[in-house]
């Protein structure tokens, strides 16, 4: 095989390789995430059976995967996430990155009512599990 043929073959193979865009499924386990979500204080504020945003205390999360994917493409969103998984993770570890519009979701100081310490009190694996679970809520 000539060098030119090898080079062309190599370029074609590279062109066919999938490029990672951050849309890959999270490494977490959705079943473990569901259990964590129901045993941590998450369920005391969030309802996963009703559609987003809604909710009296915090946004409902019944269709958060769909809404998060839509939200990160809007002008109103000011966070850093580019995918639904990134948005959900950001909401857990950095809840002030984007606060869903609505007075009920803000404390008197204008900050999110979501606890700000989950990034330090939960392990990375636990957060991955919760993200994986919430991505099942379409």
Locations of the language-model features?
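Soluble non-cytosolic domains of exported or imported proteins
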Residues: 79-86, 121-125
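Bacterial Sec-dependent signal peptides at the C-terminal "C-region" and cleavage site
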Residues: 15-27
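Periplasmic/extracellular electron-transfer cofactor-ligation site
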Residues: 26-82, 93-107, 136-138
């Amino acid at each position: 095989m000539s060098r030119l043929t090898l080079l062309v073959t190599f370029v074609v193979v590279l062109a066919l390789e999938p490029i990672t865009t951050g849309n890959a499924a999270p490494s977490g386990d959705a079943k473990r995430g569901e259990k964590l979500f129901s045993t941590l204080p998450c369920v005391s504020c969030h309802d996963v059976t009703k559609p987003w945003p809604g909710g009296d205390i915090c946004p409902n999360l019944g269709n958060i995967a769909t809404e998060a994917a839509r939200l990160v493409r809007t002008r109103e969103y000011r966070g850093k996430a580019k995918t639904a998984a990134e948005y959900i993770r950001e909401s857990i570890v950095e809840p002030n990155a984007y606060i869903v519009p609505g007075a009920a979701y803000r404390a008197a100081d204008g900050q999110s009512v979501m606890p700000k310490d989950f990034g330090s009190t939960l392990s990375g694996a636990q957060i991955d599990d919760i993200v994986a679970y919430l991505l099942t809520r379409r």
